A protein has these predicted regions:
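Transmembrane beta-barrel architecture of outer-membrane proteins
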Residues: 38, 133-135, 180, 225, ...
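Bacterial N-terminal signal peptides that target proteins for export
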Residues: 2-13
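Small/polar, glycine/serine/threonine/aspartate-rich low-complexity segments that form flexible
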Residues: 30-32, 78-138, 269-287, 320, ...
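Amphipathic alpha-helical coiled-coil segments
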Residues: 40, 52-67, 170, 174-195, ...
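Bacterial N-terminal signal peptides
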Residues: 11-23
Length: 488
């Protein structure tokens, strides 16, 4: 084997490997947008955190139903049948009181020749407990005035609305997290493909140098250098494959699938970044780079802020609830039933009792005033949290837009870097074929191509992840066109 033919063969192998590394994914891969929407829908349907939040909304709705029910009358049925033996006796001295009177009357009547009609009577002893007693009562209670009831209803309504807005905010965050997790997995997959191609080329270079060394054409240092090059790429590939598995596990965690389940693939290019950027610009009415408008839009659309707003309204209702303790409560109560010594619902034992019940608390140790202070402090806490959250949202918009601009610029630079590295590698390959370049310089040229390709893959998916962050920062996908731009 001649040195020229061997190096020419090596050049062909490395060139083919480099071409394979930068080749686009297979045509069978699905379009990017379709796969993104598929994964988002799967996550929204099965994500465990989202399912828990939905149950939280159902809980707040049940609390609201309870608050509404307090406006309606309460109807209760109570029945009691008792048997008693013994117990206290109530002694009534009827005989002691009336018998002397009866005796005097009988004497007067006898003196006038009339019969004595009055007979002595015994004292009466009444048992405190009846031997048998049946009591059945139907009670109807209707609040007439109670300031606590409407205040509690308003608080429950706003808490329910806040829980729904929190659920919507979680959906938007889940959409961002799913996109970014999947883009990270794609980036690692593409990086592994580049490293695989580079590893094959490095192994071929090692085999060629070992053959040349056996034939006495090169020294041992070139063989060791080629071996070190292979080991370096293997180490990088092992780390990349491990990170790829972790990224896949996280995507499957978000969509509640087995962690090792395969993920859908998609063909991704720089054109996809530009297309998704333009789509976001169109959704924003052509003012996606207007940071002021984006900040105002985010403040208007972010469900986290709406959730805090509803919490503030609920805290205001809680203040009204605390103030209601200083007002009277008036209720209507109607009881209808029977109290009898025998089983049955007939006779004179039936009764109906209607009452207006007024309750007003004058003093309970200052607990009501403390509850009012607590409610006011809660309102103040939420107002401060609302201002802080709005500042965070505005800052998040600025950071996400800036991150995308940096990623977009880096992507353009990465494309130029790949072109420059490819050109330099082509020149190095021709010099190598002419025997005008050292082996170490040729390996460095190959490394430059690999590094440029890896950098391009990373920047491409970083740009897509940054776009997902911008979409999240402004409140998710814009469903309707915004007002026309008025700022500069």
């Amino acid at each position: 084997m001649s040195n020229d033919s061997t190096t020419a063969k090596l050049g062909c192998v490395i060139a083919l490997a480099a071409a394979w590394a930068v080749a686009p994914p297979a045509a069978a891969a699905a379009p990017l947008d379709a796969v993104v929407e598929q994964l988002v829908l799967e996550a929204e349907a099965a994500n465990l955190e989202l399912a828990g939040a939905e149950q939280g909304v159902a809980q707040r709705l049940a609390v609201l139903d309870q608050a509404r029910a307090r406006f309606l009358p309460a109807l209760d049925l109570g029945m009691r049948y008792s048997m008693a033996d013994g117990g206290r006796q109530i002694d009534i001295p009827v005989g002691d009181l009336l018998n002397p009177v009866y005796a005097s009357l009988n004497s007067l009547l006898a003196a006038s020749g009339q019969p004595a009609p009055f007979t002595p009577i015994d004292n009466v002893s009444v048992p405190f407990l009846r031997e048998e007693e049946l009591q059945a009562v139907v009670s109807l209670t209707q609040p007439v005035y109670d300031a606590r009831i409407p205040a509690a209803k308003r608080a429950a309504e706003h808490e329910y609305i806040a829980s729904r807005q929190g659920l919507d905010a979680l959906r938007v965050r889940l959409r961002r997290d799913m996109q970014q997790a999947w883009f990270r997995w794609l980036a690692l997959r593409e990086s592994a493909a580049v490293l695989d191609a580079s590893l094959e080329a490095a192994r071929e270079n090692q085999r060629v140098n070992e053959s040349l060394h056996r034939n006495g054409r090169v020294t041992r240092d070139l063989v060791l250098r080629a071996e070190a090059d292979v080991l370096e790429i293997e180490q990088q590939l092992e780390a990349t494959n491990g990170a790829q598995r972790i990224a896949r596990n996280y995507v499957n965690l978000l969509r509640n699938q087995p962690l090792e389940a395969p993920l859908p693939e998609a063909a991704v290019s720089d054109a996809d970044v530009a297309r998704r950027r333009d789509a976001l610009v169109r959704q924003a009415g052509g003012v996606a780079r207007d940071r002021g408008w984006l900040q105002d839009t985010a403040v208007e659309r972010r469900q986290e802020l709406r959730q805090i707003d509803s919490g503030i309204e609920a805290a205001g209702a809680a203040e009204d609830l605390a103030r209601a303790a200083f007002r009277p409560q008036l209720a209507l109560a109607v009881d209808a039933g029977v109290q009898s010594e025998e089983l049955g619902f007939e006779g004179d034992e039936n009764f109906v009792l209607a009452s207006l019940v007024l309750r007003f608390n004058f003093y309970n140790g200052g607990a009501d005033r403390a509850a009012l202070r607590e409610a006011r402090a809660r309102s103040g806490e939420l107002l401060a949290a609302r201002d802080l959250a709005e500042q965070h949202v505005r800052l998040e918009v600025l950071e996400s837009v800036k991150d995308f601009e940096v990623a977009e610029a880096s992507l353009r630079t990465a494309a130029k870097r790949v072109a420059a590295a490819d050109g330099a590698f082509g020149i190095a390959r021709r010099k190598r074929d002419l025997g005008q370049i050292a082996q170490v310089e040729f390996i460095d040229a190959r490394r430059a191509v690999t590094s440029a390709q890896l950098n391009q893959q990373v920047n491409r998916f970083q740009a897509l992840s940054a776009l997902a962050a911008v979409e999240y920062a402004v409140g998710g996908p814009v469903r309707s066109a915004p007002p026309p731009e008025t700022g500069p």
